[in-house]
Amino acid sequence: MSFQHREIEKKWQDYWLTHKTFATSDSEDKPKFYALDMFPYPSGAGLHVGHPEGYTATDILSRMKRMQGYDVLHPMGWDAFGLPAEQYALDTGNDPAVFTEENINNFRRQIQSLGFSYDWDREINTTDPNYYKWTQWIFLKLYEKGLAYIDEVPVNWCPALGTVLANEEVIDGKSERGGHPVERRPMKQWMLKITAYADRLLEDLEDIDWPESIKDMQRNWIGRSEGAHVHFEIEGHDEQFTVFTTRPDTLFGATYAVLAPEHALVEKITTATQKEAVEAYIKEIQSKSDLERTDLAKTKTGIFTGAYAVNPLNGEKMPIWIADYVLATYGTGAIMAVPAHDERDYEFAKTFDLPIKAVVEGGDIEEEAYTGDGKHINSDFLDGLGKEEAIEKVIAWLEEHQKGEKKVTYRLRDWLFSRQRYWGEPIPIIHWEDGTSSAVSEEDLPLILPKTTEIKPSGTGESPLANIKDWVEVVDPVTGKKGRRETNTMPQWAGSCWYFLRYIDPHNSEELASPEKLKKWLPVDVYIGGAEHAVLHLLYARFWHKFLYDIGVVPTKEPFMKLFNQGMILGENNEKMSKSKGNVVNPDDIVESHGADTLRLYEMFMGPLDASIAWSETGLDGARRFLDRVWRLFTNEDGTISDKVTEQTGGALERSYHETVMKVTDHYEGLRFNTGISQLMVFINDAYKADTLPKEYAEGFVKLLSPIAPHLAEELWNKLGHEGSISYEAWPQYDESKLVDDEVEIVVQLNGKVKAKLTVPADATKEQLEDLAKSDARVKEQLEGKTIRKVIAVPGKLVNIVAN
């Protein structure tokens, strides 16, 4: 007989919502546990089976911690601004707010149907003005501290669409919508100075419990490099440019320089004879993305400007080229080329027949660049020195002659924070006619995103907000000065940078969150989500958190103490699930056919939480069969509690039960849910073999099952005679003394060969073991006619008799 999952699951979901079972307490007398999921973007497609994997993991921890006496904060919300809703609005003419609300309602319904123990009174939505008021407030604080500024940055401009495109909207130099040509064009953009926090973002990784692979991704993204800035004069011009190099010791081997085509000096220094070729080259590369430009496998392209730099060490002339593999947004936008000792420079020099001069001993530069270490040669006062010594000496020379200085740089660039979009948080800045800018006052926040039917490109590179004149154009009531509101909006990252803080105090209209509540709940104890957010989201959230720490808003330096990335659930064919492949599994279908508890159990039992594993209908059926076995063990045909469940204690299941409590608790704590479930299965197998199931063990088992299969557990808990929910019952304890076997199995060897296995008292002495072995019928038979020479007894293990 199987249980009626539709009826039972609806009954308990209604109960939890009505009774606010999972409402968070802010009491001071309990330890706290904050379990956070990466909140979803509410897409039109709805939830897929990949979402519940991480959500079930945090839910298991949350349910267990409540039963262990913790105050648990386990919230859910919506990362609801973003490009898809805007594209939908452009395609249909419908309001993205309405579309978003419909999607959120669908997501909420789906999530509630899976029985997660969220506190729905704390639900947040990044598009709610009461939420983005505080996103705007954080921006104003960054602006006040000089960490938000405007800069000219190359962007993807599509002339045909009259709009700026995100990198993911550009495919092979053309717009995803309509296939129109896209070019790189400099535009004024808001930037956030994340580089000011680079060292702290790097150093504080040591203090948090994150997978080492994720920490390495963050370290590589930040990319700290020690080296030198070298200043190059330009022959015949009163100009100079600066390059950063980690190998200033190879400066004697620098034979040419390369500037990014967008570098500010290119126009000034290009000679008349080269002007046409340089302009043609710049036009040609305008449609290339940064990724295409820096592709190592592509053929090197470039153009000579006609100008020469002067090598500061030896005064030699170095031709200045431009090439697309040097980016204006990376480093200083200029490099010194040492082709003898750098593969990319070598390839470029060979392509354009530029001089190659070896300055480090080793290798054969006729064949390839030598990138190893060695003594310096052809380097004047550096000759004979090793790398480290030569670097120190050349930096000292550069500093003494004011031709350069020691420098630490970062791969990390400041964060481009503006989007030419409608569906995002308005940036609370006004630009005045006299060229000044000022922030919207805090009292006037939130600056509401205006409703409009004109969600179409402005044609000027500004966002569609530029079309709404009565919103954009303002007059200072005091001075009468005219101004225009900032028309760019914030990126989707903005709302997700700090959402975990708002869950702590979601209805506070006076401040981002109360300091007392932030002190109680921070940092987040466990954060579970997909590895695709391992770099940018986590880096941006850490940056904002550190900034808020600096201005006294939050009490911790880091937001997330423990981070875990769940793996991906693949289609049955081991391919990534996607609509185009037709292999997407909808959780609604599984909840209907097998039940939410089955889906939760199956996704946790598939394998390790961080592994990527293929979906299997057979595995899903197996998970349901296990829950049916539990139901049949606990209940009679008429639905009453089984006669097998008795009031007696101890008995045959004693050791199995205590071992199950110990192992399941340990495995849940360690996020090893698959092995925890295996142990639950072991106990059920043992319970079927036993004549009776002590009620104490039945209740303990139901508690252990409840984080995984909460609906079934609630129903069984009621059938065991309890009122209300199991959610706050005490988590089972195990007795270590019950884990020790009274008896153990030992082997008996004759001349080193196993002849028998005996079950003996666990505390038997050597003498007792010897007597037991000698008196065993099989051993006696083997010893007949032999003389015992020696007996070796090892308690708990073996007896070896030497005889001949």
Curated annotation (Swiss-Prot):
Q: Which residues bind ATP?
A: K579
Provide the GO biological process annotations: leucyl-tRNA aminoacylation
Motif 'KMSKS' region: chain residues: 576-580
Judging by the UniProt lineage, the source's domain of life is Bacteria
GO MF annotations, alphabetized: aminoacyl-tRNA deacylase activity; ATP binding; leucine-tRNA ligase activity
| Subcellular location per the Swiss-Prot or TrEMBL entry | Cytoplasm
Q: Kindly provide the name given to this protein in its UniProt entry.
A: Leucine--tRNA ligase
